Amino acid sequence: MATFQFDLVSPEKLAFSGQVDQVDIPGVEGDFGVLAGHAPVVAVIRPGLLTITAGGNQQKIVVLGGLAEVSDKGLTVLADVATSVAELDTAQFAQTISSMESSLAGKQGSELDRAIERLDHYKSIQHQLNATAMH
């Protein structure tokens, strides 16, 4: 299988850089996969699990939004936050969800709508993590 250059960058670090076979990205308009030779595109990323496949191995990364750019040079993802599932503190993640739920009562209108949407994204990630842990 043909490979391509993939760089995953967050404000804290270069989370990944190397040749990959495929990257599956949680897009705002739907999840999508990128292979070598993919058409150029820029897409907004929603919070979710990004999956990197290289040499038959998969690595899952939690991303909390950002941008993906596919060009003739490869794929670059600029993520607001990027944390490897292996490094994720699942208890802390669950506590964050609990805190988000508690704070909903103090919000109204569009602020409440945004908070609910963000909470839904976190719960979706938690569900994906739990499903991944069972495999």
From Swiss-Prot:
Record key words, sorted: ATP synthesis, Cell inner membrane, Cell membrane, CF(1), Hydrogen ion transport, Ion transport, Membrane, Transport
A molecular-function term among this protein's GO annotations: proton-transporting ATP synthase activity, rotational mechanism
Pfam families per record: ATP-synt_DE_N
Gene name in the database record: atpC
Keyword Chloroplast: no
HAMAP family per the UniProt record, alphabetical: ATP_synth_epsil_bac
Major localisation: membrane
Gene source species: Rhodopseudomonas palustris (strain BisB18)
Compartment(s): Cell inner membrane
GO CC aspect terms: plasma membrane; proton-transporting ATP synthase complex
Purpose: Produces ATP from ADP in the presence of a proton gradient across the membrane.
Annotated membrane topology: Peripheral membrane protein
NCBIfam families cross-referenced by the UniProt entry: ATP_synt_epsi, PRK00571.2-4, PRK13448.1
Protein name as catalogued: ATP synthase epsilon chain
Matches recorded under InterPro entries: ATP_synth_F1_dsu/esu (IPR001469), ATP_synth_F1_dsu/esu_N (IPR020546), ATPsynth_dsu/esu_N (IPR036771)
Subunit and partners: F-type ATPases have 2 components, CF(1) - the catalytic core - and CF(0) - the membrane proton channel. CF(1) has five subunits: alpha(3), beta(3), gamma(1), delta(1), epsilon(1). CF(0) has three main subunits: a, b and c.
Family of this protein: Belongs to the ATPase epsilon chain family.
